[in-house]
A protein has these predicted regions:
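Short acidic/polar alpha-helix capping motifs at helix-coil junctions
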Residues: 1-3, 17-20, 32-36, 52-56
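The conserved cystathionine-beta-synthase
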Residues: 13-31, 38, 80-97, 103-105, ...
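A glycine-centered beta-loop-beta connector
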Residues: 27-30, 35-51, 93, 101-117
Length: 143
């Protein structure tokens, strides 16, 4: 199966200079916990999650009013193209201990996101359980 068969499209993005308050508001309004961070040309330079905000800013007593996305984002973007196989997504999640992979078009711009839940639609229950366990046991923050 190809990524394009499972990808959640219409991905929202945010710029690295956006405020943390702006990100939090967007996440709350859209009921999402993950946003690709893009440069002025729309290409991904990182990702930010609600957990990144908590761990990298709030837990460290950071100034939330003045904080910017680039202070909390993960800079190493895991991405695939829509025409790639879902096995690559599963392998990326396992290798990097992540639960979401960005889907980018041929020009490198975000077009969607594949989550661990999306993998559940593809894999048999036993395999999903093993993949989820591996990802959750090894979840780490990387920059």
């Amino acid at each position: 199966m190809r990524v394009q068969d499972f990808v959640k499209k219409n991905v929202r993005t945010i710029g690295r200079e956006a405020s943390i308050q702006e990100v939090a508001r967007l996440m709350a309004d859209e009921d999402i916990g993950f946003l690709p961070v893009v440069d002025s040309s729309g290409k991904p330079v990182g990702t930010i999650t609600d957990r990144d905000i908590v761990v990298r800013l709030i837990a460290k007593g950071g100034d939330l009013k003045g904080a910017r996305v680039e202070q909390a984002m993960t800079k190493d973007v895991a991405s695939v193209r829509p025409d790639e196989d879902m096995d690559k997504v599963a392998q990326l999640m396992k290798d990097r201990k992540i639960s979401r992979v960005l889907v980018c078009d041929q020009g490198g711009k975000p077009v969607g996101v594949i989550s661990l839940g999306d993998l559940a639609e593809r894999h048999e229950e036993e395999e999903v359980g093993r993949t989820v366990k591996e990802v959750k046991e090894g979840t780490t923050l990387t920059h």
